[in-house]
């Protein structure tokens, strides 16, 4: 099996290090193409106004080959698939992200966007996140992925689909729930401050608010109950029900 790994926390992050070691135990070829620094919440941005630079990044142990890129997570996967790897991978895995990627967070997430870039290029992908901010246990997420990925050999993913996986920090084998994306927004988003010259500036902060707390089918509900959430996502954002209504009254030809 050939696996390409990326992330948005950067190549030096603990999460991607634990994921690399886990993937080396189940794949004969492992490649890591990751940003040179943290690029959290950069979405699906790509670099078009300057050249990208790729440097070989050797690891102290294991058989993985690595490159560090001065670009976004989507840049990393795009460059890896189109220019760095001699042969396409069987799977792209993005993570292990520091913190959850639940609900509409996937629209901001560089981790999930790296996985989306893979399926744009016809490679199945998984985005995996550790749903915690402190006392991080990346090993529990890495162990889960080591057991989960081999199951895909018997049950291949569909064309143009990725799996968004969120793993509780205290996961104890309670189980997996197949979920949908919940609705999530942030309140008290900006911390307003004044600099020594009297000019106003803002730090983005914010507290997450789940808008579907009464729905047990959401990813956030599953994680809050101690389950691993697995949410299938695809590229097609079309609202087909409204498409029919729109075609019914617009003067289309």
UniProtKB/Swiss-Prot annotation:
Record's protein name: 5'-nucleotidase SurE
Role according to the record: Nucleotidase that shows phosphatase activity on nucleoside 5'-monophosphates.
Paired cysteines (S-S): none
Entry keyword annotation includes Nucleotide-binding: yes
Entries under PANTHER family matching the protein: 5'-NUCLEOTIDASE SURE (PTHR30457), 5'_3'-NUCLEOTIDASE SURE (PTHR30457:SF12)
Protein's UniProt keywords contain tRNA-binding: no
GO CC terms of this entry: cytoplasm
Organism from which the protein derives: Desulforamulus reducens (strain ATCC BAA-1160 / DSM 100696 / MI-1) (Desulfotomaculum reducens)
Entry-linked Pfam families: SurE
Gene: surE
InterPro entries attached to this UniProt entry: SurE (IPR030048), SurE-like_Pase/nucleotidase (IPR002828), SurE-like_sf (IPR036523)
